[in-house]
From Swiss-Prot:
PROSITE patterns recorded: CLPX_ZB
HAMAP family (UniProt xref): ClpX (MF_00175)
Keywords: ATP-binding, Chaperone, Metal-binding, Nucleotide-binding, Zinc
GO BP field: cell division; proteolysis involved in protein catabolic process
Protein's UniProt name: ATP-dependent Clp protease ATP-binding subunit ClpX
Task performed by this protein: ATP-dependent specificity component of the Clp protease. It directs the protease to specific substrates. Can perform chaperone functions in the absence of ClpP.
Origin organism lineage: Bacteria, Pseudomonadati, Pseudomonadota, Gammaproteobacteria, Oceanospirillales
Length: 426
């Protein structure tokens, strides 16, 4: 190794053979046969090797495509219920990526792309299903809100912004982005105002559907590179969307009425089955019978409906399902809060009646699983504020009365405190 003064035995100043810095500008300079390398270049080489190893591992993971049953089992770890939707999604996603990996280019058989439409109430798990799927397959994933989109040239986000967000998620690696998953939420909010073609400009409804058509079907989008307007001289990135999987979702409030009207119209005449109001189907059962014509009647244009041939319906979560969501998934909310308290050395216990009270409250708010975290945050806020400053607290117990606001959480102190209390009681 060169000496600390930055000179060799002959007094000559030494330089890194890679970056050109002299020894006075770096911490270490390692000598080889007629060459030198500094500690900064060593770190850089390590980073390059580490990235290549990670990429090779990721490519190795991509080579093995999990079977539909494996995909379904992974979804079960994170999403409670929605069995039919999981099955539909597992098969659709498996076939999509099988199509990409097979790369069939035959004159006889061309495998088309099957994008997915998720229909279900707020908080039923639409976004979580798509997100979990992307994580399992190790592909880039982004979420877009259809209500913020407008036609190009109008105030709002262009549909190309969706692809830019996906590129950002994978550090502008175009090849990775082209195999990613895009979830567009609130798609029902861009339905046209009537089922007749619009003669006036509808920039946030039918216009957005038209703009999304090519993107979903497959087109080459020109996306500004990193920096965007700051570096206008840079060439635009060309991103092919034909291999991206698009999942669109929405609550579609009122769709059940459209379906019911169609079914009832089909049951008119002497042979019609007479149904009483008592025999009305549950909302989930009605939505499960959705047909493309119902979606067109609701306000989606026929061309858009044709681009999302796979339809999966999700049911509204019951109180029992919400209790399961609180405790059973791998990253359940209760497990998260238990871990947070454990980091303070405190055990957190939720009684069974407390879990039921939380689920009941979420049902009353009609927010599905999405409302569970806000309820727990509200209940635990003061405790999370106080506990880090309190000594000797070993356990916090939450029961139903805490959830309803009738009492405070029970704090249990260490054995010394408990013995003092026992002595006083004695």
């Amino acid at each position: 190794m060169a000496d600390g003064k930055g000179k060799d035995e002959s007094g000559k100043l030494l330089y890194c053979s890679f970056c050109g810095k002299n020894q006075n500008e770096v911490r270490k300079l390692i000598a080889g046969p007629s060459v030198y390398i500094c500690d900064e270049c060593v770190d850089l080489c390590n980073d390059i090797i580490r990235e290549e190893v990670l990429e090779a591992d990721a490519e190795g993971d991509e080579e093995r495509l999990p079977a539909p049953r494996e995909i379904r089992n992974t979804l079960d770890d994170y999403v409670i219920g929605q069995d039919r939707a999981k099955r539909v999604l597992s098969v659709a996603v498996y076939n999509h990526y099988k199509r990409l990996r097979a790369d069939v280019k035959s004159e006889d058989v061309e495998l088309g792309k099957s994008n997915i439409l998720l229909i279900g109430p707020t908080g039923s798990g639409k976004t979580l299903l798509a997100e979990t799927m992307a994580r399992l397959l190790n592909v880039p994933f982004t979420i877009a809100d259809a209500t913020t989109l407008t036609e190009a040239g109008y105030v709002g986000e262009d549909v190309e912004n969706i692809i830019q967000k996906l590129l950002q998620k994978c550090d502008y690696d175009v090849d990775k982005a082209q195999r990613g998953i895009v979830y567009i939420d609130e798609i029902d909010k861009i339905s046209r105002k009537s089922d007749n073609p619009s003669i006036t400009r509808d920039v946030s409804g039918e216009g957005v559907q038209q703009a999304l058509l090519k993107l979903i079907e497959g087109t080459t989008a020109s996306i500004p590179p990193q920096g965007g307007r700051k570096h206008p001289q840079q060439e635009f990135l060309q991103v092919d969307t034909s291999n991206m999987l698009f999942i669109v979702g929405g609550a579609f409030a009122g769709l059940e009425k459209v379906i019911r009207d169609r079914v009832e119209k089909g049951g008119i005449g002497f042979n019609a089955e007479v149904k009483s109001k008592d025999s009305e189907k549950a909302m989930g059962d009605i939505l499960a019978g959705v047909e493309p014509e119902d979606l067109v009647k609701f306000g989606l244009i026929p061309e858009f409906v044709g681009r999302v041939p796979v339809i999966a319906t999700l049911t509204e979560l019951s109180e029992e399902a919400l209790i399961q969501i609180l405790t059973e998934p791998k990253n359940s909310l209760i497990k998260q809060y238990v871990h947070l308290f454990a980091m303070e050395g405190v055990e957190l216990e939720f009684r069974e009646d407390a879990l039921r009270a939380v689920a009941h409250k979420a049902m009353a708010r009609n927010t599905g699983a999405r409302g569970l975290r806000s309820i727990l945050e509200s209940v635990l806020l003061d405790t999370m504020y106080e506990v880090p400053s309190l000594e000797d607290v070993t356990k916090v117990v939450i029961d139903a009365s805490v959830i309803t606001g009738d009492s405070e959480p029970l704090l249990i102190y260490s054995q010394q405190e408990e013995s003092k209390v026992a002595g006083k009681d004695g």
